Amino acid sequence: MLIAPKALSSSTLSREELAADKKEAVHYGHCALGKRAVYVGSFGLFSCTHYLPLTRVERVFKRLAVSKGFYEGKAFGTLSYLVVCYDGGKERQCRFEREDELDMMLSAFRSRTSIPVGKN
């Protein structure tokens, strides 16, 4: 691990736990899901620069938006975001280039954790 990811929550993992978990994490786009933490990218440019321990994550869901061209009558596309809610109301979103990768990550959340997936 060249650069250790920064914790977004007040709760953190030890350096050894973090290194082992990130090494075994399954990557989906700029994000990854490990056994102890979810790793999110920064501004869609860098992969896994921040992490949240799964014990602090309250729920995750998919947010869809449309590009500016939709409103101008030009070519448009959908923008897919993974939104992670943590620490009593804080949110972090990570943009995915491919919606199917986001769907695979949400499916992994459903099967590997007890964290609620979807809006309540």
Please state what every model-predicted region is.
Residues 2-3, 59-120:
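Acidic, Ser/Thr- and proline-rich intrinsically disordered linker/docking segments
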Residues 27-29, 41-46, 87:
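Short strand-coil-strand connectors
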Residues 20, 39, 87-91:
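Generic, low-specificity signal for short hydrophobic/alpha-helical stretches with a mild N-terminal bias
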Residues 22-25, 43-45, 76-77:
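Short solvent-exposed loop/turn micro-motifs enriched in small/polar/acidic residues
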Residues 1-36:
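Anionic N-terminal interaction surfaces
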